């Protein structure tokens, strides 16, 4: 599913991401834009053999199990396929674990490079939330 910007913002808010660990909703929407272009079915292979999954491009080396990543830790205890659903519950629950891990949203390269220090509020402007 390719989400609309405000549609994804509303779903993220409903699942408790707004100000989770101090990150406003705009941060999460911005991260999703540059990680997956709001596409829940996005997958991208990394040079280390791991794959990133879903709207927040969650990585199979650490966070989920896809059955093909050597030494996968599966810290969110989920199959990676759960991260490709149009229901973002699994993605959000795993993202909460990731952002609590010590590096905050710096865990997302796209957030670090394209969202951090910018006017992320713009990503939810005009949305009825």
Swiss-Prot record:
Record keywords, A-Z:
Antimicrobial, Bacteriolytic enzyme, Disulfide bond, Glycosidase, Hydrolase, Secreted
Please give the GO cellular component terms listed in this UniProt entry.
extracellular region
The enzyme's E.C. designation: 3.2.1.17
What InterPro entries does this protein's entry cite?
Glyco_hydro_22, Glyco_hydro_22_CS, Glyco_hydro_22_lys, Lysozyme-like_dom_sf
Against CDD domains, the record matches this protein to:
LYZ_C
Q: Could you tell me which residue ranges the C-type lysozyme domain spans?
A: 1-129
Chief subcellular location: secreted
Where it sits in the cell: the answer is: Secreted
The GO terms describing molecular function are: lysozyme activity
Which residues does the Swiss-Prot or TrEMBL record annotate as the active site? 35, 52
Q: What class of enzyme is it?
A: hydrolase
Note the SUPFAM superfamilies from the entry. Answer: Lysozyme-like
Positions of disulphide bridges: 6-127, 30-115, 64-80, 76-94
One BP annotation, GO: defense response to Gram-negative bacterium
Q: So what does this thing catalyse?
A: Hydrolysis of (1->4)-beta-linkages between N-acetylmuramic acid and N-acetyl-D-glucosamine residues in a peptidoglycan and between N-acetyl-D-glucosamine residues in chitodextrins
Q: Which domain of life is it from?
A: Eukaryota
Further information in the entry reads:
Lysozyme C is capable of both hydrolysis and transglycosylation; it also shows a slight esterase activity. It acts rapidly on both peptide-substituted and unsubstituted peptidoglycan, and slowly on chitin oligosaccharides.
What does the subunit section of this Swiss-Prot or TrEMBL entry state?
Monomer.
Q: Report the family membership.
A: Belongs to the glycosyl hydrolase 22 family.
State what this protein does: Lysozymes have primarily a bacteriolytic function; those in tissues and body fluids are associated with the monocyte-macrophage system and enhance the activity of immunoagents.
Under which name does UniProt file this protein? Lysozyme C
Origin organism of this chain? Colinus virginianus (Northern bobwhite)
């Amino acid at each position: 599913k390719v989400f609309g910007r405000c549609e994804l913002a509303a779903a993220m808010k409903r699942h408790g991401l707004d100000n989770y660990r101090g990150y406003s909703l705009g941060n999460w929407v911005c991260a999703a834009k540059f990680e997956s272009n709001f596409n829940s079915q996005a997958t991208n292979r990394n040079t280390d053999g791991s794959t990133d999954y879903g709207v927040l491009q969650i990585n199979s080396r650490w966070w989920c199990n896809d059955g093909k990543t050597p030494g996968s830790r599966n810290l969110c205890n989920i199959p990676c396929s759960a991260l490709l659903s149009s229901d973002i519950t699994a993605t959000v629950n795993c993202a909460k674990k990731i952002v609590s891990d010590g590096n905050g949203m710096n865990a997302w390269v796209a957030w670090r490079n394209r969202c951090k220090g910018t006017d992320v509020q713009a990503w939810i402007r005009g949305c009825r939330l």
